[in-house]
Amino acid sequence: MVLWLQLALLALLLPTSLAQGEVRGKGTAQAHNSTRPALQRLSDHLLADYRKSVRPVRDWRKPTTVSIDAIVYAILSVDEKNQVLTTYIWYRQFWTDEFLQWNPEDFDNITKLSIPTDSIWVPDILINEFVDVGKSPNIPYVYVRHQGEVQNYKPLQVVTACSLDIYNFPFDVQNCSLTFTSWLHTIQDINISLWRLPEKVKSDKSVFMNQGEWELLGVLTEFLEFSDRESRGSFAEMKFYVVIRRRPLFYAVTLLLPSIFLMIVDIVGFYLPPDSGERVSFKITLLLGYSVFLIIVSDTLPATAIGTPLISVYFVVCMALLVISLAETILIVRLVHKQDLQQPVPLWLRHLVLERIAGLLCLGEQLTSHRGPATLQATKTDDFSGSTLLPAMGNHCGPLGGPQDLEKTSRGRGSPPPPPREASLAMCGLLQELASIRHFLEKREETREVARDWLRVGSVLDKLLFRVYLLAVLAYSITLVTLWSVWHYA
């Protein structure tokens, strides 16, 4: 009987002991959980059953909207030959993860948590123009807010293909696009939007390093929706147009100014006398110096397989003008240095150059004043050559100055007896020498007069070609300066 009473009492007390043990165990567990940091408890709570391979939406029909933003930090390089632009941007993207939401009151009012990027789902948004992997720092974490908003901030070194137009170099403006799009998901799964207003993105230069060769004019944005050729569906993409302009001061100093100075020196070289040989050697030296200058600056000029900058055409034309100037100088020197082998100036050439062209260039008075002393010198030479002396003495000699005619003349006129034969022969020899001297002086003066005529023709042609050359250089320079000014301030 007593045994039965003990068993009954034990049966009544056992459930009570078990209940107290459970209560004690729960209290111990709660005490143990309360000692863990809230960040750990929140991280374990969010990632306990999380699957990063599944798009984070509860309704699969609902697309995930990714808001993106980009700020240009620096223009690292512009490779015109390979058509590649390297930029450094601050990239930000935001999306809502419906599986990363919590109540801040349950976790010490934590509203924001950093989570490893490898532990959650991340949209596969890439840049279509990527041609190389940049050296971007690895940011292994993202921020998550309690509403489920994920913030992914990371700097990117972007190496992209860009169609660079170098025709206006060094006053060129380039427009390169960065197209952000999902590589796999259609717009029904991932949609893309702009995080900030387009006006703010366009004028944001707050972090741009503005000390380099390129100046950032603005960043334009455009949203597009396109379909692929395989009809997999429509894809959303956001384009950022990076508009940059080259600073031309360095190239103007190193390329344009030396070329301009050499052309000015070539123009000044026309003031050397056309009958001097120094002008030819001067022009050849100048042409050689310009060739060396082009060799030095050839590495500075951009080059592509599809286009040539206008400044290269400018250098080629300047070289051609120097060659034309040298050819003109050689022609003029050839005209004025024919010496005794030259023929008299043809009448048609004399009329065309010394009358028509000289009158057109207002050079008539200069030619008249230049010709006066020559004519006066010729008159003096004629007087000195014995033109008045020989007729007075020529009657005393025959054709060769013989004494026969002199004797006949003396007898016919009743003159005094002739001088001795030796004196007559000496006089005739003297007259013959005077005649030879006169003939030589006349021939030399004729040659000099022909040379002076050719010199006058060469001088007029030299002034004509100089003015034509000067007009060509000025017209070409004004055209290029106008084009470059329009491009620079457009």
Curated annotation (Swiss-Prot):
InterPro entries for the chain: 5HT3_rcpt, 5HT3_rcpt_A, LGIC_TM_5-HT3, Neur_chan_lig-bd, Neur_chan_lig-bd_sf, Neur_channel, Neuro-gated_channel_TM_sf, Neuro_actylchol_rec
Location(s) in or outside the cell: Postsynaptic cell membrane; Cell membrane
Q: Which reaction does it catalyse?
A: Na(+)(in) = Na(+)(out); K(+)(in) = K(+)(out); Ca(2+)(in) = Ca(2+)(out); Mg(2+)(in) = Mg(2+)(out)
Show the stretches that span the lipid bilayer.
250-270, 286-306, 313-333, 468-488
Q: Which Pfam family is one of those matched by this entry?
A: Neur_chan_memb
GO biological process assignments: monoatomic cation transport
- Sugar attachment sites: N33, N109, N175, N191
Task: State which tissues express it.
Answer: Expressed in cortex, intestine and liver. Not expressed in muscle or spleen.
Please, which domain of life does this record's source organism belong to? Eukaryota
List the ranges whose topology is Extracellular: 20-249, 307-312, 489-490
Membrane topology (UniProt): Multi-pass membrane protein
SUPFAM superfamilies given for it? Neurotransmitter-gated ion-channel transmembrane pore, Nicotinic receptor ligand binding domain-like
What's the chief localization of this chain? membrane
Disulphide bond pairs? C162-C176
Extract the CDD domains matched here.
Answer: LGIC_ECD_5-HT3A, LGIC_TM_5-HT3
Q: Where is this region: HA-stretch?
A: 426-462
Q: Which GO terms describe its molecular function?
A: extracellular ligand-gated monoatomic ion channel activity; GABA-A receptor activity
Residue spans, topological domain Cytoplasmic: 271-285, 334-467
Q: What does this protein do?
A: Forms serotonin (5-hydroxytryptamine/5-HT3)-activated cation-selective channel complexes, which when activated cause fast, depolarizing responses in neurons.
Free-text comment on this protein's domains from its UniProt entry = The HA-stretch region of HTR3A seems to be responsible for the low conductance of HTR3A homomers compared to that of HTR3A/HTR3B heteromers.
Alphabetized NCBIfam families for the sequence:
LIC (TIGR00860)
Question: What quaternary structure, including any partners, is listed in this protein's UniProt entry?
Answer: Forms homopentameric as well as heteropentameric serotonin-activated cation-selective channel complexes with HTR3B or HTR3C or HTR3D or HTR3E. The homomeric complex is functional but exhibits low conductance with modified voltage dependence, and decreased agonist and antagonist affinity. Heteropentameric complexes display properties which resemble that of neuronal serotonin-activated channels in vivo. Interacts with RIC3.
| Name of protein | 5-hydroxytryptamine receptor 3A
